C-alpha cells in the first residue's frame, strides 16, 4: 500500500513539473569586476523590453538596439537580440552607456549579460553565466 502511495505522489509531482513552463530567469552576474544583483539584471532587462515594445529609446541614446552576436555566444533563447546597458547605480536612462549590457530577444526573453571589459576593440565577452 505504501508503495502505491509513493508512486501516486511521484506521478503527481511529475505532472506538475511537466505542466509548469521553464522560463529563462535573470540571475546575478559579474561583468569585469562589477557585480550585479538579480534585481538589477531584471530591472535592466525589463527596461529594455519596455523601450523595445514601445519602439522607443532611453533618452537621446540608441538603446535598446540590435545585437548581432558576432562573438557567437550560446544564449539560452533564440534571437533576434537587443542589447541594453546595465548600470550599478540604477536603470539606464540615457547618456554614457558604460561597458556592460543585458541582452534580450525580441520576445523580451532574457538571453544573457555581456561586457566590453576585457574584450578587444569594440567586441564583447560574456559576463558570468554567459558563454
UniProtKB/Swiss-Prot annotation:
Enzyme Commission number, as recorded: 4.6.1.24
Pfam families, per database record: Ribonuclease (PF00545)
Signal peptide limits: 1-25
InterPro entries given in the database record: N1-like, Ribonuclease/ribotoxin, Ribonuclease_N1/T1, RNase_U2
Active site as annotated: 65, 83, 116
Taxonomic lineage of the native organism: Eukaryota, Fungi, Dikarya, Ascomycota, Pezizomycotina
Protein name from the UniProt record: Guanyl-specific ribonuclease F1
Recorded coiled-coil stretches: none
Modified residues (Pyrrolidone carboxylic acid): 26
A GO term for molecular function: RNA binding
Family stated for the protein in its record: Belongs to the ribonuclease N1/T1 family.
Disulfide feature: 31-127, 49-108
Top-tier EC class: lyase
Keyword annotations: Disulfide bond, Endonuclease, Hydrolase, Lyase, Nuclease, Pyrrolidone carboxylic acid, Signal
Key word Signal present: yes
Catalysed conversion reaction: [RNA] containing guanosine + H2O = an [RNA fragment]-3'-guanosine-3'-phosphate + a 5'-hydroxy-ribonucleotide-3'-[RNA fragment]
Amino acid at each position: 500500500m505504501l508503495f502505491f502511495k509513493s508512486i501516486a505522489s511521484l506521478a503527481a509531482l511529475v505532472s506538475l513539473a511537466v505542466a509548469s513552463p521553464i522560463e529563462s530567469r535573470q540571475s546575478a552576474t559579474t561583468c569585469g569586476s562589477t557585480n550585479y544583483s538579480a534585481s538589477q539584471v531584471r530591472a535592466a532587462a525589463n527596461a529594455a523590453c519596455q523601450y523595445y515594445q514601445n519602439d522607443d529609446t532611453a533618452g537621446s541614446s540608441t538603446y535598446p538596439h540590435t545585437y548581432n552576436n558576432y562573438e557567437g555566444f550560446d544564449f539560452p533563447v533564440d534571437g533576434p537580440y537587443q542589447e541594453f546597458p546595465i548600470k550599478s547605480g540604477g536603470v539606464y536612462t540615457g547618456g554614457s552607456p558604460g561597458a556592460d549590457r543585458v541582452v534580450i530577444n525580441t520576445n523580451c526573453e532574457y538571453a544573457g549579460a555581456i561586457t566590453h571589459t576585457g574584450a578587444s576593440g569594440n567586441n564583447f565577452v560574456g559576463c558570468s553565466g554567459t558563454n
